[in-house]
């Protein structure tokens, strides 16, 4: 019965995150005749409230120690491992690119046409903030802090790590991809983050690693932008 309560809670959190928050953001944008930027900003604020609620829920429902251990400099080696994993991921996706299937990109709700007429604004920057900020925080709070403290906590067979990695892979399979290769990739990422969280009990570390992993995707376009800006403004 205890596990059932946690399972239903996790499903409820994902339902709220993937569907209800979007409806609320679109409704508020429509009422105030806002832009895409306004909608994405609303979504970020709503997700911040959801993360705060999840943390409060966890503190109430499970034994949870949110004290942060002292930062250790050898943690930096894990960031190098993230780079290696990202390079390996790119290599695998390049080899099997014909088998990578993205989930249908269909919005759950329709925005008024007037929203699009106002332009994108800074929505790209806000999506970037989501990718390296609220997204990793939300996923690590759920998949690491919640799942690993609610199910098989400190299991000597590392079932907590396996479950965390499995759910991380399944979530990306449901919401972003439709192929087994992507599932394996995110399952490995999930095991990596879960193993580090179990070893060091530092949610900050796995959030930063996850955030850095997502940021690494943007390194090339950011470098191209900086190079072009310097070239055309100072060298030509």
Model-derived features: positions:
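Alpha-helical transmembrane segments in multi-pass membrane proteins
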Residues: 6-60
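Transmembrane helix-loop-helix hairpins at the membrane interface
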Residues: 121-236
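Juxtamembrane helix-loop-helix connectors linking adjacent transmembrane helices
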Residues: 31-37, 62-135, 227-236
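Cytoplasmic juxtamembrane interface segments
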Residues: 51-72, 205
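Membrane-water interface at transmembrane helix exits
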Residues: 21, 25-29, 55-59, 63, ...
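Membrane-helix interfacial "entry" motifs
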Residues: 2, 32-36, 40, 66, ...
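Alpha-helical transmembrane segments
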Residues: 3-20, 77-82, 161-165
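Alpha-helical transmembrane segments of multipass membrane proteins
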Residues: 13-21, 46-51, 81-89, 93, ...
